[in-house]
Amino acid sequence: VACCWIDSVPSIFISGQVYLNQTIGNTGLRQVGVQEFDIVNMVKSSTKYAVIVKDPNLIKYHLEKAYFLSTEGRPGPVWIDIPANIQNAKIDVAKLIGFKEKKKIINYKRLNKKIREIARILLKSKRPMLHLGQGVKISQGEKYLRKIINDYKIPFALTWNASDLIESSHKSYIGRPGAFAERGTNFIVQNSDFYLAIGTRLPFMVTGYNSGDFARNAKKIMVDIDDKELVNTNVKLDKKICCDAKYFLKTFLKSLPKKFNPSKDWLLYCKNIRKKYPIVLDEFKSQKKYINSYDFIDSLSDVLKNDDIVVTDMGLSFVGT
């Protein structure tokens, strides 16, 4: 649940509970029923919606509301706790009350104006880069993203949980910045003059703890569907847009002219700095006694097919991949 909450994974958790009259309710007790536990209050801080069903005729309402909230806006987990007597109750499906969605009202005219302004800033830059996170994947904005990087050759970096968003062999790919990342990519970030983060919340693992120095020479712009991330980020932003990543990319693409490419010197710099500071060093490949983990992952990547699935644990296996 905590991972789904932090990584914005839409998910529905349904748990069984003791009979409603055997729950602690508002008594302040720790337990009444056999093996009872107040799971709802425990998961409230890491879910978008958590409820114990007290009326069997409201089951449709709770299920529909949970599904809507799980997938609406920034996705996340929801939890429905169903007592045993509610599970056993007879209901008339035709009479069940449903949930009426209330979608957020967006001023698209104002939003589009902001996006066009970002496009104008990009056109004035000489050393631009994009930093793309899982928000792009969640919004299914890959189509517009790929069009942008293919047509305009803008160097782009990925966050760890968006590593499979676009192939790492792409000519404009510059790696992953951050504390556990690529040194060359960090140099690129620090030398950019236009830094656009889309669908990534810019945690300390990316910016470092002295976040005031992150991309210090760049106009820093952040696009995120969660306004709280925009307000509470540790990076001083020049522009911030609360917006779905797919909508932003689609509108951003429309705002760009047919021809625009970053400076050739900048593209050459990005290429050379990554060559100068590779992840897999030559000495890694010449180890005799043991297999170097970085060399192993690099070799494994060469033989994996596009549809192969790789599951990693934390620690070295996670960082290495």
Predicted regions and their residues:
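Active-site diphosphate/adenylate-binding microenvironment
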Residues: 271-321
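Long, charged amphipathic helices and adjacent flexible linkers at domain junctions
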Residues: 97-114, 261-291
